[in-house]
């Protein structure tokens, strides 16, 4: 399923953007229209370097607002977790207010986003919030799929193989054989010949057996 099919299913199969319908349409993008330098040089630049209508708060979140055509008023679109979500919200409002003359942050916003038929501020705010949330959900699914693949590969690599089992047993065997060298070192420190390792030695034997053992 391609991106157009996915979003057509999300917004309804009969949905058709008022901008993309009716002939060829090549939207004007923010990347092709560089922003003018900010006039306030004494203050920190809060505008996003590329996205239109997007500013960063001190908290790290992003806000979006758009000026209404031929008016001094602005429509507040909300506060968002990422700049991309705010940029999507901007595109909804820009298309609703300016149509094909809108400068968009994303080229696919012309056909991906559901644009309200009314230019009422509340309708635009609702559609902008919906577009931002849909974009967030899409990014979450992509991230989840990527992490799921990584986790699957990690689990496959972490399987306990028979070779690893044999290596673990071999280490235990070495530890057991190391007991003889330990006894050799102890005997050397006492200037005595090293005794043989008798794991089933009976401590109740007679003293003569001890003498015959050390005589060899």
Curated annotation (Swiss-Prot):
InterPro entries associated with the record: AP2/ERF_dom, AP2/ERF_dom_sf, DNA-bd_dom_sf, DRE1A-I
Resulting phenotype, residue 49 to T: In strain: cv. Cvi-1
Keyword DNA-binding carried by entry: yes
GO cellular component, one term: nucleus
DNA-binding region, residues: 50-107
Region (Disordered): 15-42
Principal location: nucleus
UniProt motif (Nuclear localization signal) ranges: 35-47
Residues making up the signal peptide according to the UniProt record: none
Record GO terms (molecular function): DNA-binding transcription factor activity; transcription cis-regulatory region binding
Similarity remark: Belongs to the AP2/ERF transcription factor family. ERF subfamily.
Protein name, per record: Dehydration-responsive element-binding protein 1C
Organism: Arabidopsis thaliana (Mouse-ear cress)
Gene field: DREB1C
């Amino acid at each position: 399923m391609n991106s157009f099919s996915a979003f057509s299913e999300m917004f309804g199969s009969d949905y058709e953007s008022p901008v993309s319908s009716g002939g060829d349409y090549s939207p004007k993008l923010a990347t092709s229209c560089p922003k003018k330098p900010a006039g306030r040089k004494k203050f920190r630049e809060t505008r996003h370097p590329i996205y239109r209508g997007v500013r960063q708060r001190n908290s790290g979140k992003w806000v979006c607002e758009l000026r209404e055509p031929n008016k001094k008023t602005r429509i507040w679109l909300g506060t968002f977790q990422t700049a991309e979500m705010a940029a999507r919200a901007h595109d909804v409002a820009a298309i609703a207010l300016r149509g094909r003359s809108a400068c968009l942050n994303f080229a696919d916003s012309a056909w991906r986003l559901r644009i309200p038929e009314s230019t009422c501020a509340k309708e635009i705010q609702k559609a902008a919030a919906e577009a931002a949330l849909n974009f967030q959900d899409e990014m979450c699914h992509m991230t989840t799929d990527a992490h799921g693949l990584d986790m699957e590969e990690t689990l496959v690599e972490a399987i306990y193989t028979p070779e690893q089992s044999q290596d673990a047993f071999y280490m235990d065997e070495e530890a057991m054989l190391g007991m003889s060298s330990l006894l050799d070192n102890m005997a050397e420190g006492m200037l005595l010949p090293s005794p043989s390792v008798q794991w089933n030695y009976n401590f109740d034997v007679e003293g003569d057996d001890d003498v015959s053992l050390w005589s060899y």
